[in-house]
Amino acid sequence: LVFRLASFPIHLGLGATAVRQPSIEDKDFFEAYAARHTSDGAEGRLVSMFTFSQPWTVWERHPRGAELVVCTSGTITVHQEQADGTVQTATLHAGDAVVNPPGVWHTADVTAPATALFITAGIGTEHRPRESTW
């Protein structure tokens, strides 16, 4: 019954389903996740938890839906690149949250270990290298 969300994410799908996923440590996790849940389309959500000890090395975006990020411990600084190229920054402490809108590139910085809960429209997620930090 009990499992570690950081190791085994949940898929929230059509029909109010909540399906535990295989280990996120599998190198093919995201590709296999998309294949398993593509029929849920933009309404499916991946619920995951990650602990970070270093700034992200990539930008990412979720073209098919918004992402909720909830800081559960530590401090996380989230950067969102707007369509006009400007960057908005939000610093989250435990209990704070931010929404990454659909299609908005985002990345994050930490200076000490921090943990966040993510609820993501994960199918179609894109990544690009990160060239700078703030």
How does the language model describe each region?
Residues 42-43, 52-56, 73-77, 84, ...:
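Short, charged/polar surface micro-motifs in flexible loops or helix N-caps
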Residues 82-102:
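Short acidic-glycine-tyrosine-enriched beta hairpin
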